[in-house]
Amino acid sequence: MKKVFKRIFPISLVLVMVFLFMPITNVFAGSNSSDKILVGYWHNFDNGTGIIRLKDVSTKWDVINVAFGESIGDRATIKFSPEIGTDQEFKEDIAYLNSIGKKVVLSIGGQNGVVLLPDENAKKNFIDSMISLIDKYGFNGIDIDLESGINLINNDKDFKNPKTPQIVNLISAVRAICDHYGPDFVLSMAPETAYVQGGYVAYAGNWGAYLPIIHGLRDKLTYIHVQHYNAGGNTALDGNNYTQGTADYEVAMAEMLLQGFPVAGNADNIFTPLKQEQVVIGLPACPSAAPSGGYIKPSEMKKALDYLMRGIPYGGKYKLVNSNGYPAFKGLMTWSINWDAKSNYEFSTSYREYFDNFKQPPVTEKPSIPIGLKGEAISKTQINIAWNLAHGATSYDLKVDGNIINNVNNPYKHINLKPSFMHSYEVRAVNSVGNSEWSKAIIVQTKSESDVEKWGANILYKAGDIVSYEGINYRCIQTHTSLIGWEPINTPTLWEKTN
């Protein structure tokens, strides 16, 4: 996302203080009538698009991403101050927007923003500075828009178990911030396509480099809006290359996140799909907002949305894997609110009206039976279960050893088990019409006492536990719950080598 700075001197503005005490509402419970959202970036600088005070942003927007929080000399500590108005006025503006159902999110990075987290000290500085800024101004969440410094190191080959310190520490830091604020905290991401969909053709350098971040934070992620611009073209699930700024491109790139894909073409290494409501498309508000291309006319984009959400074809080359579409797809993001205002509000007016008139297609059939049910014994006490998405499903039930658990996440972690015990699993899909039949059952056995477990993240290890990491055995010397970045090789206070 491009920006050119021109410093603006603070101006004196007045806002009634009562707004500071109005309640904050849910992120999707604003003044607009649809559950679809419009997310826009707001410039904390002047690049010739005009100055808009935060409180004067159009009510057509549901989420306002403030661009940008940026790092200071250590490249880890984040700073932010409003270039327009005073600190107090900015706080009051956020409080006012919250009072009318909007969310205001601090975006970090941008085209020129660099955040580097090579070690624990840098990670701590990042976490502390972010929490300080969020508390100071009352931000409702954070947006990760890092376009520099996110590159995989040479031996980092598994997106599920990353080794790149920058990525490992970023995941751990963002998770800590989200945990600090709880489930209503907004977490969004705005990577370029090379960092996400690019992982379909290669996993090295910046290609696919966001996949471990998305995977490591998918349980915290509110939504992701990949930038479908300044990209040229990308390869889709059908193996064809599509050009930015076309309906085919918008649909194809979005479905990669909705269906999942083999990383670097490896069918044994699948990036599993995100939930429909976690997927948003990022677009430029006008041609000038994306100098390297990607603008699409609203009339053409609406064809793409009709196909993506309703399954109504427009005669394009790309064919949806799920021909019925994805009605819970969440919405659109744009760079930027300021560019939209400069272009006579074409973006916000066109898409707000479209989304407000969107009606979920009626559900008339039960969902299909889930297929691809598989399980893996992670340890002596944990089995992970996953399955393919079922057509028409809005949720899933899991039958574990004959007991039904409703509305489970995919993948599902079955924990607190005993070693060498076998467990049975079946899954069914659910929607408003009813339930599918149960899938075929699978049997999975936990690891035995004699097995040396591979180290994993988010597992409770007790003093004396033995794990294997990169072919070396380690003994736990301090009870803890593991996190990405706390691998035995990195934490001598928690682990010691053993035979």
Regions found by a protein language model. Give the residues of each.
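Substrate-binding cleft of secreted/luminal carbohydrate-active enzymes
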Residues: 44, 267-361
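Beta-strand-rich modules
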Residues: 414-433
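Tryptophan-rich substrate-binding surfaces of secreted polymer-degrading and adhesive proteins
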Residues: 422, 442-499
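Short beta-strand segments within Ig-like beta-sandwich modules, predominantly Fibronectin type-III
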Residues: 403-409
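Chitinase-like catalytic core of GlcNAc-active glycosidases
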Residues: 30-252, 256, 276-280, 285-299, ...
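Pro/Thr/Ser/Gly-rich low-complexity, intrinsically disordered linker/stalk tracts
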Residues: 362-391, 419, 434-448
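Sec-dependent signal peptide cleavage junction
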Residues: 20-31
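Short beta-strand elements bearing conserved aromatic residues within extracellular beta-rich modules
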Residues: 396-398, 474
